[in-house]
Amino acid sequence: LSFFEIVIYYATVALNHFPTIQRGEKNMLEILELEQEDEKPPSFAQSKDSWLVAVLANIKDERIELPPDVPEDALADFDHIETIRAIQAAIETDGHRTVFIQADSNLPYALKQIKPDICFNIAEGLGGDGREAQVPGLLEMLRIPYTGSRVVTNAISLDKTLTKRIWRDRRLPVAPFQEFLTGDEPLRPEMRFPLFVKPAREGTGMGVDTGAIVNNEAEARERAKWVIRTYRQPALVEQYLPGREFTVAVMGRPDSKLYSRHPEWYDVDGFHRFPIMELDSSCSITPGIYGKAAKSKDIGEEGAPDFYCPARVDDELAKKLQYYAWRGHNLLGALDISRVDIRLDAKGQPCLIEINTLPGLTPDFSDLCVIAKAEGITYKELILEILYLGASRWGMLEARELTPALKKGAGSRVMYRR
């Protein structure tokens, strides 16, 4: 079996520990065949004040033992059932009904049976280099509204190399990088040691530990070949950035204030500027590396990084970080919410690392939730804001009239001129 086939098998076993709907016995052709009555897109009454919201996710079960040829972090992107319950509880406080549906191979049939008004999507997908686009693609085929970024953006954002190429070509700062398919490719002359090697199409710090930093060509090739062999995908090799690390959340779009429950949160461009979070991993279980081991630690736990939110930065650096995150979000066509990771180079200049269009939503643990809490935004408010931003894109909400004060927005637009 291939790596992805093994992951899919064990993920499905894990998911079966959490049944939420009756499995259907129809084959896939019957599942995907749309009845004539379903040919029309869903119609939503503007006055409708209660929806059936399906929360879509992949659930991890740490009781499942993976085979020895599969990396121990293979299911790191998946969510715990407690996170799903927290999202459901937040949505239900506003009068909606919720149901959790596992994002496995039975998802098409489940959606046809349950007929949700909208899906709150945090599903990572099962296998493949575009797995985060699998569920959005299915939802668009079935014409079911959903939250978050759409198909193309979710496919691109998981591919770190492609994301960096887009950012670089649009003059956003990224460290020099190169993708290795075999590990034997000639090293480009602009690649100066130390370098940093990681899987090109993974998230949650998978494949990232202290061994990711390499100091010579032999180490670089050995690490790249290990990544390619272990994760069955290309290795991304990039200039190591020794400076401070930040994560910047981006929420909204140009017309956010017309539909948001909190229009006062948004600037004149329709985006909310969360406080910047700094991640200090110098004291973590993997010093200087914010990888899987460090990310799995609770805040304050021994071996966890130190977090500072708001970050301890001057106004000039704050403007750069906010602008680059906002620009990176928009260039990829991200919607509703994202989180952009940025690190400083040896000269103290910011370089974009990657974007997460499906940021974690575990209360009091995930970076986005900690950032929101630091600003005084409750978990319930965050979840409902994401839900309503998504719903408004599908015609499920009426636009409001903006007062002069709301038109002005929460501060000036995000701008930085180099």
Predicted regions, residues:
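Alpha-helix N-cap recognition
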Residues: 103, 215-217, 378
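ATP-dependent carboxylate activation and anion-phosphoryl transfer catalytic cores
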Residues: 9-14, 20-25, 29-41, 166-168, ...
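Short phosphate-binding/catalytic loops that engage adenosine nucleotides
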Residues: 96, 144, 172, 232, ...
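Short acidic/His/Gly/Ser-rich catalytic and metal-binding motifs that mark active-site loops
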Residues: 62-67, 203-206, 299-301, 362-363
